[in-house]
Amino acid sequence: MAQISLTFPDGNARDFDAGVTPAEVAASISTSLGKKAISATVNGAHHDLQWPIDADASIAIHTLKDDAQALELIRHDCAHIMARAVQEIWPDVKVTIGPVIENGFYYDFDRAEPFTPEDLGAIEAKMKEIINARDPVRTEVWDRPRAIAHYEANGEPYKVELIEAIPGNEPLRMYWHGDWQDLCRGPHLQHTGQVPADSFKLMSVAGAYWRGDSSRPMLQRIYGVAFQNRDALKKHLHMLEEAAKRDHRKLGREMNLFHMQEEAPGQVFWHPNGWTVYTTLQDYMRRRQRENGYVEVNTPQVVDRKLWEASGHWDKYQENMFIVEVDEEHAREKAINALKPMNCPCHVQVYNQGLKSYRDLPLRMAEFGACNRYEPSGALHGLMRVRGFTQDDAHIFCTEDQIQDETARFIRMLSTIYRDLGFESFDIKFSTRPEVRAGSDAVWDKAEAALEAAIRTVTDDFELDPGEGAFYGPKLDFKLTDAIGREWQLGTFQADFVLPERLDATYIGEDGAKHRPVMLHRAILGSFERFLGILIENFAGKLPFWLAPRQVVVASIISEADDYVREVVAALTRAGIRAEADIRNEKINYKVREHSVGKVPVILAVGRREMEERTVTLRRLGEKQTSVVGLDALVADLAAEATPPDQRPDQPAV
């Protein structure tokens, strides 16, 4: 039999018979590894242990201790085990697909009756039976006629449709455990017992159209989470409990920040408290941008389709745009406009007004641009996923030689802003040229080198994502981790060689000839709406004092103190503090509870003693202890605390 050479991660190589499987390779290394192995990476591709290897290759054997590969297989097998459990309990249920998703898995079922919470408990119990049975997982490759005939005979029309959509040259792999079978690319574990029985949980049921098409049948999607051990599952469930407590929609009601309603899906109704937070944050961003040399512009929200066609967005983005048809007076045909989904084409129009010289560059142009994008109603989620939003958007027009300095400047600015807003660190992902791209290799070489060099002025710890840049330029993505461990992708920085060409942006170089500027797209917060949702949840509503909508409430203990309450509020207001009076005829404990639920950072109680001594009784949000403080000293302290970070004397400029 022909021999092949397999190279292991340590660089050693061994010869095996052609057609050897990873399971046989693992067993040849040690009996222990043969039992612990769950999958293998062969020439960079993840396969199950039954995959035959026919040619020289690199190979790495994985066990349950290999986080990424183990988690993928555990979650994948959980989806299949769940589908088997459902069909063993309800044999008439039809199965469709069940992929791995972040933190877990789901499977879509066609069942006449809705699944109930009690059903989820029964399914979990059946899954544990299947796991404890340790049924071996086996696989076969079938031809299309055999696979279609099998699923037609078993009344599984969704599987037949899936097979018919698979390219004819792609093998059809069938996986079994016990008597249950599914069509799947794999890979899978060696037996069902390799799934830890105490590390998964079924979470919820939701509706989902087959193939995401609202004209197709509505299915029932069961979601589950799965991890490598019980402790990881408990940690995740605790995080979900914390997330529920911090839900910005719940806190938004309690703090009277905003609401949303059916008549304007995906659009935010900002209340006075919420709008105060919004404008305070926007004012802060405006100052930070100004000190970094940005000019601020404002561009139209309704723009003729001609501009979107010229920019390329009409072809690529039309389904996400709100289209407006207008009967223009004396026009032969209707004017077709769109609400702008992004600001960049409009910024090029501003740039193009007047001749630009290389001496004018870099030109940093910012806008708090109101944008609208169509999102399916099922995808909308409070402030996190909306249709109408405002971006902290900016575009930098520069020469190729200026890319590195502008990138480094941006990263420093972003780092300062994130720190000011309570996020001490962030992660960077650097996405490089895709196979299909615009621009010459020389330009890409220069841009990628500039971005990487700029990153390294801040950190050497970044994630490289080869081939995942946009077709028009390399990009950086910035991720934050919040107080309960969730990651949020927020900031972006992207070089663009295409839009200046499409929209004919030029500058006069030192040689007197016209050149195309590079356009650097950048955002720090993303959208104000989403960022405020993240901020509310990160702080569980207890926003930094300078951002809190109501910074101080002064509450009377007795009605005789009402005038002093007003005097205290006036003194705080003169010092630039957002203060309110509460002189209702209610007990002080009632007032404290109500304003604590509303996340007011400081509550000042005023009674007869405070009035006579010109003091206040101070209570901080979340603290049980109170203290009596002189009014003048307190006003000075709170005024310093209310000062935005960029305006404090100890805060250096970006």
UniProtKB/Swiss-Prot annotation:
Domain TGS: 1-63
Entry cofactors: Zn(2+)
Enzyme Commission number(s): 6.1.1.3
One of the Pfam families matching this protein, by short name: tRNA-synt_2b
One GO term of the biological process aspect: threonyl-tRNA aminoacylation
Gene3D superfamilies named in the record: 3.10.20.30, 3.30.54.20, Anticodon-binding domain, Bira Bifunctional Protein, Domain 2, Threonyl-trna Synthetase, Chain A, domain 2
Recorded superkingdom: Bacteria
Catalytic activity: tRNA(Thr) + L-threonine + ATP = L-threonyl-tRNA(Thr) + AMP + diphosphate + H(+)
Annotated cofactor note: Binds 1 zinc ion per subunit.
InterPro entries tied to this protein: aa-tRNA-synt_IIb, aa-tRNA-synth_II, aa-tRNA-synth_II/BPL/LPL, Anticodon-bd, Anticodon-bd_dom_sf, Beta-grasp_dom_sf, TGS, TGS-like
PROSITE patterns in UniProt: AA_TRNA_LIGASE_II (PS50862), TGS (PS51880)
Gene Ontology MF term list: ATP binding; metal ion binding; threonine-tRNA ligase activity; tRNA binding
Function description: Catalyzes the attachment of threonine to tRNA(Thr) in a two-step reaction: L-threonine is first activated by ATP to form Thr-AMP and then transferred to the acceptor end of tRNA(Thr). Also edits incorrectly charged L-seryl-tRNA(Thr).
PANTHER family: THREONINE--TRNA LIGASE, CHLOROPLASTIC_MITOCHONDRIAL 2, THREONINE-TRNA LIGASE
Subunit structure comment from the entry: Homodimer.
Protein name, UniProt field: Threonine--tRNA ligase
Gene source species: Dinoroseobacter shibae (strain DSM 16493 / NCIMB 14021 / DFL 12)
Lineage: Bacteria, Pseudomonadati, Pseudomonadota, Alphaproteobacteria, Rhodobacterales
Gene name, Swiss-Prot/TrEMBL: thrS
